[in-house]
Amino acid sequence: MEKMSRQLPLNPTFIPPPYGVLRSLLENPLKLPLHPEDAFSKDRDKGKKLDDGSNSPTVPQSAFLGPTLWDKTLPYDGDTFQLEYMDLEEFLSENGIPPSPSQHDHSPHPPGLQPASSTAPSVMDLSSRATAPLHPGIPSPNCMQNPIRPGQLLPANRNTPSPIDPDTIQVPVGYEPDPADLALSSIPGPEMFDPRKRKFSEEELKPQPMIKKARKVFIPDDLKDDKYWARRRKNNMAAKRSRDARRLKENQIAIRASFLEKENSALRQEVADLRKELGKCKNILAKYEARHGPL
């Protein structure tokens, strides 16, 4: 069945003036009724009143009594005319207008009592909105530029670790030197020799040459005076101090070498364990690359 289209009759009270349609619409706005039946009944009543009344039509006037915008003349002077900067966010917040319709729909507060923080989005919100895709099915440009391969995990922290001082590393070594050897390797005093911290310079570790004894010179008894015996005692004390210092240094080097041997064996065992663990990791990585491709 074909639906009969019925045309609405024009309002006979509306007479377009000769000076423009836009101005006439602004001055004389039309109000369309909600129900077409009421419009037909009102048009019939108005037609009867117009037939009974005078033939001169009356132009309806606008309800606004103030001056119209086009009747005003703004003073313009090229020297004094200046443009003022206006912040859009501030203007919207002062007038209680939300910057986006989503905030206006979901805001529980009235427009005049909205906090300023809700009307001005932060930089983080703008960055998140820029990175988020417009539609759920369309990926963002950043995802297209940096594709994530299957199985690839992004590290939570990319910062490189701070450098470690090798001297601060403590290797667990089960080494306990003999207290008697420590006493022979320590200088008389409160501080004891520590083979874990004591380091020797290259000069101290150089091989010492063999000291040859000087050939004895025979001196008759009548020439052995007090000056001779004083010089003899002085030389003997210097030789004794030299022997004690050399023996002390040899004992320290021996205890230090014993500790380094223990530490070397512990480090070798640790390196062997690390190599075994590295071999397992390489095997797992090779199996993963064979199944999913290279990383």
UniProtKB/Swiss-Prot annotation:
This is Hepatic leukemia factor. It comes from Rattus norvegicus. Residues 227-247 are annotated as: Basic motif. Its main location: nucleus. Induction: Accumulates according to a robust circadian rhythm. CDD domains: bZIP_HLF. It holds the Pfam family bZIP_2. GO terms for cellular component: nucleus; RNA polymerase II transcription regulator complex. It comes from the Eukaryota. The keyword Transcription applies. Residues 34-69, 93-160 are annotated as: Disordered. It is found in: Nucleus. Residues 34-52 have a biased composition (Basic and acidic residues). The gene is Hlf. Isoform HLF43 is abundant in brain, liver and kidney. Isoform HLF36 is expressed only in the liver. Both isoforms accumulate in the liver with different circadian amplitudes. Isoform HLF36 reaches peak expression levels between 8 and 12 p.m. Isoform HLF43 displays a more pronounced fluctuation through the day. Residues 248-255 are annotated as: Leucine-zipper. Keywords: Biological rhythms, DNA-binding, Nucleus, Transcription, Transcription regulation. SUPFAM superfamilies: Leucine zipper domain. Belongs to the bZIP family. PAR subfamily. The keyword Phosphoprotein does not apply.
